Every structure is written in structure tokens, then in C-alpha cells.
Amino acid sequence: REVSHFKGKITYWDVINETVILPVFNKYDNAVSRICARYGRMTLIKEVFAAAKAADPEAQLLINDFNTTDKYEKVIEECLQAGVPIDAIGIQSHQHQGYWGAKKIKEVIERFSRFGLPVHFTENTLLSGMLMPPEIEDLNDYQVKSWDTVPFMEIRQQEDLAEMYGILLNSPYVKAATYWDFADGAWLNAPSGLVRVDGTPKPAYDRLKSIVESRYAAK
């Protein structure tokens, strides 16, 4: 329905999200997990991609996941072998437990570039406050009443953001990068936004604005 309604207006669609865990995921009861349990992951993926392609043959269709291990690579391989019309690979990079660092970012890009498809960093977050404990496996399980931004971590956030976007924007394989939270508290109540709760910009906002303007502003 949505793809048909916005045909010709929206180019890129995240067709299906987080399929790596779907075969065993039963934490939340919803239509997607029930359908996957009944018919299998690949059947579900093939059906939703076919429906999206039929609704808008010119749209660019993404598969997307937070899992950047070889399990995601295997899912992509199976999809391509089955003829699923994937146009780009989505990578989530919610870094609530700490910045990935340049080495991991480059390694992830290199591994997923082997498919010959554009790589999109679809959900990127960097914190300017206390990090989530490393033992948390599902980020949604971490629920706190107060999660404040901290001045010295705001500096760290903008430094990490600058390094990360420098890598992404200069990679021939990465074609898009989306910052997930504009304001603090938008997801998990985390201080992961570019602006604070009161709407004032953090150093990361100014840094990203400068990066974008210097690269894309009309000459």
C-alpha cells in the first residue's frame, strides 16, 4: 500500500527489517514473526520484495539488519541465489554500547561490499552520555528513567561522528548514511541525538552540518 501510494516520490524502501533473528524470534508477538514462523524466513522475504517491486518497479529495495555478522551475509547470499531483487544492503549501527571505531567500520564495509551492491548505513547513533552496559543483548531491554547528555561526552560524540562519516563518505561502496535520532530521548530515552532535549544543538550537530555543507553545498 505505502509503496504504491508514494510511487515515483520515494526512491528507497527498507522492505524488510532484521530478518536474521526472525526464525527464532518470539519475544514480541506480531504479524511478521507469526508469518515467518509458519512459512519460513525465505518465503517471507521473497513475498515482500515481490510485492514491493510490483508496486513500484523503479524503486530501490533494501534489506536491513542490525546483525553485521556472517549470519547476515548468509541471509543475503540465500536471497540473491533465490532471485530476490535486493538493490542495496542496509546496515544498522546503533552504538549505544560504544563507538565501533574506524577498524570495525571499515571491516563491515569491506565484508558487505563483496555482494556488489550499494551499502547504506540506515540507522546510525552515537551517544553523548553514559554507555549502555555491554552485557545487554537486546537494546530494548535497557530501560532507565533518566539518561542525560554529558558535556565531555558531547565532545567525544562529535569526534566519533566526524571520523565515522569521514569513512562512510569516502568509501566507494557506501551510498547513503542516515543519522537515526535528531533529538535526545527519541529512542530508548538515550542521549543519542544531534540536539538536546531542549532543542539546542550539540557539537555533533554543528560538525555534521559542516561536513554535509562542505561536501554537498553548491559551488
List each model region and its residues.
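Active-site beta-loop-alpha junctions enriched in small/polar residues
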Residues: V15-E18, N64-T68, I91-H96, N124-L127, ...
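Active-site lining segments of carbohydrate-active enzymes
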Residues: E47-L62
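Substrate-binding cleft/loops of secretory-pathway carbohydrate-active enzymes
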Residues: L62-Q92, M130-I136, G185-W187
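Aromatic-rich peripheral "rim/lid" segments of glycoside hydrolase catalytic domains that contact
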Residues: H5-G8, D14, T19-M42, E47, ...
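Surface-exposed cleft-lining segments at the edges of enzyme active sites
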Residues: A31-A37, L61-I63, I91-Y99
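Short, acidic/polar
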Residues: R1-V3, T69-C79, Q158-I167
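Distinct, well-ordered alpha-helical segments
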Residues: V24-Y28, T68-G83, G101-I109
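Structural preference for beta-strand elements that scaffold enzyme active sites
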Residues: I10-D14, E58-L62, P85-G90, P118-F121, ...
